[in-house]
Amino acid sequence: MKATAKAHPIQGLVKYHGMRDTERRMPYHDSISVCTAPSHTQTTVEFRPDADEDVYVIGGEEVEGRGAERIQAVVDRVRELAGFDHRVRLESENSFPSNIGFGSSASGFAAAAMALAEAADLDMTRPEVSTIARRGSASAARAVTGAFSHLYSGMNDTDCRSERIETDLEDDLRIVAAHVPAYKETEQAHAEAADSHMFQARMAHIHAQIDDMRDALYDGDFDAAFELAEHDSLSLAATTMTGPAGWVYWQPRTIAVFNAVRKLRNEEDVPVYFSTDTGASVYINTTEEHVDRVEEAVADCGVETDVWGVGGPAEVLDESEALF
């Protein structure tokens, strides 16, 4: 009853903000994202009928408190579906920095859900597994189905699931990841989202924005898709900044990257757009032809960069790749 899985983190394109059901982590509205590769999380799980307690280890450190509670929500859902109460050992490692706005919770819970479902011998499609991953992080649902994916808010626990969107943009997209370290508190931001006076304004346009993003992806329209993502980042930030806690995640270098991107676009006609989730780090979306110029301009802002492509769905790995 042991399995190992890998999943890629996500960049939110039309991001969800706030949850109407916090226990099952069901968001107020639909969302669309793209997975980033080769960044990934790898997770090994083993159900142990004779063990007395669950053990969760991330990056070599045992997880306790709220982090353990979120993992247990995913584990408990798998146990419920499998019809047993075996204890589990879970170990996970990231190939990229966590908690700076690069979607590590998405890849983490997606890999966990995929490995747990396999170890429990559940015969499930990826959209079905996405409903399990969602118990840890709604973004993880989209990391299960991979590439460009759409999480439907749905009417219930079953149809609040992710499905992949086919698009010609997958091969040419290059993502320059600008690392701007700064602590973030995404869970609290979600908890108070509806208390922002900007939240209803966001809800008023988000459904049309989802439709526009799907159309742009279906049409393979790079500029339309990533201009929408850039605008959505600003809308999300406005809602977060005007919540009760007044969260401001951006740092001076975040703004410097924004300005560098707009300068490339306006003065050099480079197809390039920025995007942020809840964090100070920045995704810069461009094409293979222009990625070197974009990376050079972003590096001039004094930030570390990586270049990523589009990542596929979560997958079960061979037993030889187990972490324990």
From Swiss-Prot:
Could you cite one Gene Ontology molecular function of this protein? phosphomevalonate decarboxylase activity
Q: Could you tell me the Gene Ontology terms of the biological process aspect for this record?
A: isoprenoid biosynthetic process
Its domain of life?
Archaea
As for pH, the annotation reads:
Optimum pH is about 7.5.
Q: Which UniProt keywords apply?
A: ATP-binding, Isoprene biosynthesis, Lipid biosynthesis, Lipid metabolism, Lyase, Nucleotide-binding
Q: Which Pfam families match?
A: MDD_C, MVD-like_N
Q: What is its EC number?
A: 4.1.1.99
What does the activity regulation annotation say?
Answer: Is strongly inhibited by 6-fluoromevalonate monophosphate but shows negligible inhibition by 6-fluoromevalonate diphosphate (a potent inhibitor of the classical mevalonate pathway).
Tell me what reaction this enzyme catalyses. (R)-5-phosphomevalonate + ATP = isopentenyl phosphate + ADP + phosphate + CO2
Looking up InterPro entries in the UniProt record yields: GHMP_kinase_C_sf, Mev_decarb, MvaD-like, MVD-like_N, Mvd1_C, Ribosomal_Su5_D2-typ_SF, Ribsml_uS5_D2-typ_fold_subgr
Q: Which family does it belong to?
A: Belongs to the phosphomevalonate decarboxylase family.
Q: What does this protein do?
A: Catalyzes the decarboxylation of mevalonate 5-phosphate (MVAP) to isopentenyl phosphate (IP). Functions in an alternate mevalonate (MVA) pathway leading to isopentenyl diphosphate (IPP), a key precursor for the biosynthesis of isoprenoid compounds such as archaeal membrane lipids.
- Protein name, as recorded: Phosphomevalonate decarboxylase
Q: Which gene encodes it?
A: mvaD
